[in-house]
Amino acid sequence: MEKYSIRSNIVHKLDDNQPLLSERVTARLEAVNRNRVVKIVPQHRYNVRLTPSMLNRDGYINASLMEFSDVGQKYILTGIPSEDKVFAFWQMVLEQRSPTIIQFADNVEEKLEHYDKYFPDKGDVWSYGHLQVERKSYAIHQGNFHTRNFILRKGNETHRVLHFTVFGWTETTTPIMQDFLALRKVMKDTGALNMINPASALFRSTMRRYIHTPPSFAPIIQSARGSSRAGAFVVIDLLIRMIDGKKTNLYSVEDLIVKCKHMRIHCVPVALHHSFIYEAVLDYLLRRNPRFQDFKEPLIAYSESCFVKWSSMDKEIEKFINTKTWFLNESSRNKFLRSVMPPVV
């Protein structure tokens, strides 16, 4: 076995060209004082725009609409809104017709910090001008997560959204795999990550002209900054969708991370969460097909470095996941970065 570079090194290399880029984009958006974390900002073309209002004259929100056409999936990544930006968050939920919000809470004691709780309790109705937010139900699930159902009303418009609060996955920890799998099962059973875009709604959205970003019907993935955990979750979901869809030659984890960074600066920057991507996908592979247990050792070893050559990789496993495309070599990575990243000026 020959190791070329360690995973943590490649994560830092991918971020090397981001600080200057983030400063340039932040300055362009004139959003320094509106972002909780200045460096975590959306690339301009992927920034969700809201309908301007008296409280938000240019319709800005720190949220990225990320689209992966190969898989036919979109996601909105954003951070936890500060108290004075909660109205903008719920406005985005309504305007984007997002069916689901997945919030990764920072408090592992199953209690929300004050700034994490941006929604009403049962029986309460929060009003933001003509927009009202009401909680309808609440449930605690095995797997360390809670669900809430909210209904949003604005004039004649009504929109329902399912909200997940996920505990046990913080900036410095990863979730227990059993809990993560329980979460994914509920999401799969409820269709939580599927974009809700009935033909009639999609037709109306294409026929109308919008002041804001047209409805994407995309789930909202939310962590404190909308970067590391949210980005890692998106990559895991994409990879599992690819595996289930039997897509070939697309299993490059690094490629997906670079694409995420192209749409949201400093997305998936933490090596710990980078590692969890591999652990979650490998665990899914092994559970999905029990015969892969015979290949568990080489798969785990492969996932623990950025590139590993095996003298005798079994052809059966190679046929299924095509491991040589999981990583881009340095030359390919640099070429890819040049093609997707705008030049720093």
UniProtKB/Swiss-Prot annotation:
InterPro entries named in the record: Prot-tyrosine_phosphatase-like (IPR029021), Protein-Tyr_Phosphatase (IPR050348), PTP_cat (IPR000242), Tyr_Pase_cat (IPR003595)
CDD domains in alphabetical order: PTPc
Domain of life of the organism encoding this protein: Eukaryota
Record flagged with keyword Aminoacyl-tRNA synthetase: no
Membrane topology: Peripheral membrane protein
Protein name (Swiss-Prot/TrEMBL): Protein sdf-9
Major location (coarse): cytoplasm
SMART domains: PTPc (SM00194), PTPc_motif (SM00404)
The Tyrosine-protein phosphatase domain, residue ranges: 33-284
Underlying gene: sdf-9
Tissues showing expression: Expressed in the 2 embryonic head hypodermal cells XXXL/R.
Family, similarity comment: Belongs to the protein-tyrosine phosphatase family.
Compartments, as annotated in UniProt: Cytoplasm; Cell membrane
Alphabetized UniProt keyword annotations: Cell membrane, Cytoplasm, Membrane
Keyword tRNA processing in annotation: no
A Pfam family this chain is assigned to: Y_phosphatase
Protein task: Together with eak-4 and phosphatase eak-6, negatively regulates dauer larva formation downstream of insulin-like receptor daf-2 and in parallel of age-1, pdk-1 and akt-1.
Biological processes annotated in GO: dauer larval development; signal transduction
One Gene Ontology CC term in the entry: plasma membrane
